[in-house]
Amino acid sequence: MKKLIVQFTTITLLMSTSFLVGAQRYSFDPNLLVDGNNNTDTSLFEQGNELPGTYLVDIILNGNKVDSTNVTFHSEKSPSGEPFLQSCLTKEQLSRYGVDVDAYPELSPALKNSQTNPCVNLAAIPQASEEFQFYNMQLVLSIPQAALRPEGEVPIERWDDGITAFLLNYMANISETQFRQNGGYRRSQYIQLYPGLNLGAWRVRNATNWSQSGDRGGKWQSAYTYATRGIYRLKSRVTLGESYTPGDFFDSIPFRGVMLGDDPNMQPSNQRDFIPVVRGIARSQAQVEIRQNGYLIYSTVVPPGPFELSDVIPSKSGSDLHVRVLESNGASQAFIVPYEVPAIALRKGHLRYNLVAGQYRPANADVETPPVAQATVAYGLPWNLTAFIGEQWSRHYQATSAGLGGLLGEYGALSSSITQATSQYHHQQPVKGQAWEVRYNKTLQASDTSFSLVNSQYSTNGFSTLSDVLQSYRQSGSGDNRDKIDENSRSRDLRNQISAVIGQSLGKFGYLNLNWSRQVYRGPIPAKNSLGIHYNLNVGNSFWALSWVQNANENKNDRILSLSVSIPLGGHHDTYASYRMTSSNGSNDHEIGMYGQAFDSRLSWSVRQAEHYGQPNSGHNSGSLRLGWQGSYGNIAGNYYYTPSIRQLSADVSGGAIIHRHGLTLGPQINGTSVLVEVPGVGGVTTTEDRRLKTDFRGYSIVSGLSPYQEHDIVLETADLPPDAEVAKTDTKVLPTEGAIVRASFSPQIGAKALMTITRANGQTIPFGAMASLVNQSANAAIVDEGGKAYLTGLPETGQLLVQWGKDAGQQCRVDYQLSPAEKGDTGLYMLSGVCH
């Protein structure tokens, strides 16, 4: 559209010529520009400069685009007397672009009235310079590296706590299984709700679930309710309510109270929270449940074959994840995914601390809730050493931990600690015990190998963890009931546990992952072993995966070997054929299927058919069908699965919602820090962050999963804009705090687009450079070219334009217009003419 406009103007050619000659002087004839009316000042044009004013420009800092915004330029003169345009940038802007403004107090406003003209004096930074490239609409800044903050460091003043809003995430699943032999059926239902409230820097969060299976009645359970906020000057965070103690020094415990600790996400060199990946193999369509500290935190339905769940968000507690896979035929398998905590190693001068006071919060309502307290401190010493100490206390338990960690350079990080604990189980005498722990982790950059190892050695039978001791105290009953309360509470009998995770990139030959864990107990309790080997390979557009998993639980060993292959059909990447082979304890399964996506990956589908050989289901077949939709307002999916003995139907729905001052906005689940995209009145627009998420009919959408305390570019896809909408500035930057919902607001001009030739009542054309806009609406102002033509957007069907080429009454006029279908071209552009009075 704009290319069409250029064809009607010759000023573009003049601009290009002046750009080529640089600073060379040249002259315009005012009579040629304004048809004999020389009231327009062209002295600046004659010297190769443009008129002062406000321009939408790209700001380029040391070769990188850092912003696109309106900048005001005023006229200045060089020492030689040559006029030029000087930008008016603020200290806040320079700080936002990465300049260390606090190191240069002379930057403060260069103009006399600093309140109305807060322009900085860029000359205060030695060797700093600027150049306004008018014809590229670029303000090019050159600032020495010494004047910039370290990469990744962002001033606190730029952190955005976002808007006040109520938010809700929801997940729901219902499945019904029919047993063909006896005609019976079993229904299972599950609802997970995550309501929240953002109020300034405060974040209020809750997790509540309801589950029901078979003849058992439904049960509600609240995993946590808490309020938290950042204390930015201390780079810390305070939490009030129900949460979990950190698991870096002691085993994590759920508590109700107050917690204050540092927030590493606020540090420039932050290390993001570890999020484990849960891998396993389902023999049939199965329900996967994941618990942590006794609380159900995740539930989903997976198809037969290997599964990999990377969207499991733990409680940040450091406690292991207990995974249970419920097969369609009633069988189940269980295993533990260790929540690996990296070695404790800090840089010199870095401090990490955490303070907790409150009461124990067990998942079982029968367990007592005594007061608990915990304090931990770690500090980075010289020589790459880290010292740390911690204390954990309750009515029946006291433990002290101390250790030393070190950064070993190219050899990774290592830490070792010893914990002395005094424990008193219910109706038993106090006992003392010690435990040693060694942690090691390393990433080999050259070979792209990651390795982590955790070894805990319990040297005496008197050592126990706090949660195991407190679980033995019930509000009713007597005796040592710990095994009845939590079958996994065996720290008193645990002698040694070790876990290791190795990841190896093989380049074009794929990726190999190995995870292993072993728990050894005293007495008759058998050891638990878990080993998984996973290999993935991409060959062209096909995908190959080989997995071997062994879980030893009690006296039973489960060994599962799986091979999966996916190959695109017909050269298209949205439809695949698949084959899967699974071998488990003497039985073999072979499955073929097809799956794919459509409608920009919004629709997903799969059809699978399997044959089973070996006991007990030799010769049996099974099949499944799945259909899912990932929409702008949420996700929905349906599943059908059958075998000779059962038929199962299930449905899933999930999504998120935000209530804000402009109303209700629906979307997919809100994952942590988010942005509310605002394009008022324009629906169906996406951003480059996620092409699947479109603005609703009011022009709003939710984009989540942003990293806190980091800058993000939110860019509109202009191809999605309807013909009657135009957005001058299609990108904006946001820098949210943890859990914030920040605004990315865009200002569309909605209405018709027109090229209008404007003449004055005396027959003269409008002076070149005049501004034309709707009366009382300067946002859609257009510049009149030398032929009196102006390109206008956002026009209503009828209206009045104000044309100005000066401040005096004789330097402005008004023109009425009315859009007519006869004046509309094939491209949707109206060709208008009008007389300005």
From Swiss-Prot:
Main location: membrane
A single GO molecular function term of this UniProt record: fimbrial usher porin activity
Signal peptide start and end residues: 1-23
Entry keywords, A to Z: Cell outer membrane, Fimbrium biogenesis, Membrane, Signal, Transmembrane, Transmembrane beta strand, Transport
SUPFAM superfamilies xref list: FimD N-terminal domain-like
Membrane topology per record: Multi-pass membrane protein
Cellular compartment(s): Cell outer membrane
Gene Ontology terms: biological process: pilus assembly
Gene3D superfamilies found in the cross-reference section: 2.60.40.2070, 2.60.40.3110, 3.10.20.410, Outer membrane usher protein FimD, plug domain
GO cellular-component term (any): cell outer membrane
Free-text function comment from the UniProt entry: Involved in the export and assembly of PsaA (pH 6) fimbrial subunits across the outer membrane.
Protein family according to the UniProt entry: Belongs to the fimbrial export usher family.
Record protein name field: Outer membrane usher protein PsaC
Species per Swiss-Prot/TrEMBL record: Yersinia pestis
Gene responsible for this protein: psaC
